[in-house]
A protein has these predicted regions:
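Residue-level detector of alpha-helical transmembrane segments in integral membrane proteins
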Residues: 104-105, 117
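Short, low-complexity intrinsically disordered segments enriched in A/P/G/S/L with frequent Arg
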Residues: 99-104, 110-112
Length: 169
């Protein structure tokens, strides 16, 4: 795939370094039963590392040029969603019909990871914080998330009150 010119309005920055990509995948530890959603696959380098390692792989991309390239280069097993991750209903991807009814309570109770999504992404700086809050609203559908974030975002998240990096997220 030829290189795509990152678009500033989408805050795009792409992963290229093979060693870093392998470390990300190792930290994520994908399992053959996982349903993974990747936010902002970009040129698909992380996506390609996940193909064949998980049961289902969905990607959410807003850039139409990248979507066209991804459709040409990724296997059909990857479902590509042309959407803004800030407005995307991640829970719509999580299965809800196969949850057994509890004998004790009579309600549908989902075991800790049953039917939940695993979310991964190299998040753009300009939407990192609102996207994290959007995903927290849908946390009941997600078992875990692993994101690459710009250092400034992480510094602000872990800053102590009164510190130079402390401020509203």
């Amino acid at each position: 795939m030829s290189s795509h010119q990152p678009r500033k309005r989408f805050g795009q920055h792409f992963l290229h370094e093979r060693g870093i990509i392998q470390r990300i995948v190792a930290a994520f530890d994908p399992k053959p039963t996982d349903h993974v959603v990747e936010i902002g696959p970009g040129e698909g380098v992380l996506t390609r590392e996940l193909v064949g390692k998980v049961a289902r792989l969905d990607v959410v991309e807003i850039d139409r040029d990248l979507i066209a390239r991804l459709r040409e280069s990724l296997p059909e097993a990857v479902t590509i969603h042309s959407a803004d991750a800030l407005k995307f209903d991640f829970c719509a991807l999580a299965p809800h019909t196969d949850v057994p009814v509890s004998r004790e309570t009579g309600s549908r109770e989902r075991p800790p990871s049953h039917g939940k999504l695993r979310v991964i992404g190299n998040l753009p700086y300009n939407i990192s914080t609102p996207l994290l809050f959007h995903l927290l609203d849908q946390a009941h559908c997600v078992s875990d998330m692993l994101f690459m974030l710009q250092k400034e975002v992480v510094d602000r998240m872990v800053a102590a009150p009164g510190g130079k990096d402390y401020g509203r997220l």
